[in-house]
Amino acid sequence: MSLKILIFYFLSSIFFLTNNIFASHVTVVDGDTIKLGDIKIRFSGIDAPEIKQTCIASEGKVACGKISKDTLIAKVTNNKISCTDEGKDVYGRVLGECFVNGESLSSYLVREGFAFAYRKYSNKYVQDEEYAKSNKLGMWSMEFEYPWDFRSNN
């Protein structure tokens, strides 16, 4: 009986390991996409401004897409990243949630106002977005266009 349990736990751990991606070298593509080696991972459930996207802050026009990317770069620099593999999107990118020291990067970006809950696909980050909005954090302190609207209009 104990051998069956041991085999079950062994096989379960192999299954869970194959659904995770680990790396210490990360390249930030934009505010919601990274590369771990050759694997491009799009954070599921969030949407960040496009690199060329701008917002209007009190000091004038700012590159909010670049700010979102730079925020992610600062968070992952010199840290080990782990990501879940949740399948692929229509562009062939791996969809997943990535973590630094156990903290979800998606949750962090949305809660700080540098990405939005992508309600079209998930409600997971809605509370984080409500927090950022009510505290006027990140893009919530500016005039902005949602990334999905920006893509449609440009």
Predicted features and spans:
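Small beta-barrel nucleic-acid-binding modules, primarily SNase/OB-fold domains
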Residues: 2-154
